[in-house]
Amino acid sequence: MKPDIHPVYRTVVFHDTSANEYVKVGSTIKTEREIELDGVTYPYVTIDVSSKSHPFYTGRQKTFDSESSAARFQKRFGHFIGAKRG
């Protein structure tokens, strides 16, 4: 490996501001801010959405109508099928 070309890999604290949750993750992100957690100082990054707050991961997502578009079409226009023209 060539010296001095690889980014520094370290543990970084990401703060999900919408859920007020802190997550420690290994990362190469550069940051100016630091935070102290559990007596240890870590680089600190704020984020708006993470798996702690995203509706898909929390199970609080909106449910959509389970009726398919084909079923809706049949309900609206099914009576035209098989009708005699005349």
Swiss-Prot record:
A GO term, aspect molecular function: structural constituent of ribosome
Induction profile: May be induced under zinc-limiting conditions; in that case may be repressed by the zinc uptake regulation protein zur.
Pfam family membership, one: Ribosomal_L31
Keyword Ribonucleoprotein tagged: yes
Annotated GO biological process: translation
InterPro entries: Ribosomal_bL28/bL31-like_sf, Ribosomal_bL31, Ribosomal_bL31_B, Ribosomal_bL31_sf
SUPFAM superfamilies (alphabetical): L28p-like (SSF143800)
Assigned keywords, A-Z: Ribonucleoprotein, Ribosomal protein
Keyword set includes DNA damage: no
Recorded GO CC terms: ribonucleoprotein complex; ribosome
Complexes and interactors: Part of the 50S ribosomal subunit.
HAMAP family: Ribosomal_bL31_2
Family, as annotated: Belongs to the bacterial ribosomal protein bL31 family. Type B subfamily.
Protein name per UniProt: Large ribosomal subunit protein bL31B
Source species taxonomy: Bacteria, Pseudomonadati, Pseudomonadota, Gammaproteobacteria, Enterobacterales
Gene that this polypeptide is encoded by: rpmE2
